[in-house]
Amino acid sequence: MSKSNVTEIEEEKQIESSIVQHFICQVSKKNHDAMLQIAKQANEIARKYGALRVEYFQLSSTENMIDWTNISKTVSANQDEEEVWMEQVFYRDSKHRDEYTAMCGNDENMNRLYKQFMNLIIPGSAIVGEFSRLKV
């Protein structure tokens, strides 16, 4: 598959998603590799249950930008010992999100991974936000 075809497929997936959930948490640097393993396994399950896309990011800059406060100040992460992670899950619509969430909730492996994940993050650091696509 050519690079342009891959780009077209990714653009189609972006167009058909109308809801994205953002999950943000703090992770001790010593738990980085364990978290990556959990993310890889969870990503496989997410694809199995039809998530349009699941992406993971690590905060790479802690500098403010002009009049914008960097998220690292909002979540109060200790940059020497902790990382800030974000997971994004894309859905077609709220019905798709509900179906996906129900399937994941009934999956023993996903429940096991969720418990491992929650034990590895900094307590009290998990925040979530769901956003709907704006037509601009």
Feature roles, as predicted:
Residues L36-A42, Y100-E108:
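Short amphipathic alpha-helices in soluble, non-transmembrane regions
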Residues M1-I15, L52-D80, G105, N109-V136:
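Glycine-rich beta-strand-turn "strand-cap" elements at beta-sheet edges
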Residues V20-V27, I66-G105:
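Short, well-ordered beta-strand segments in beta-rich or mixed alpha/beta enzyme
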Residues D33-L36, Q41, R47, R53, ...:
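Positively charged, small/polar-rich N-terminal and surface patches that mediate targeting and assembly
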Residues A46-Y49, D98, N111:
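Amphipathic alpha-helical interaction segments
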Residues K48-Y49, R92-K95, I122:
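A short, structured loop/turn motif at beta-sheet edges
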Residues T7, E11-A34, I38, Y49:
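Surface-exposed interaction/gating patches
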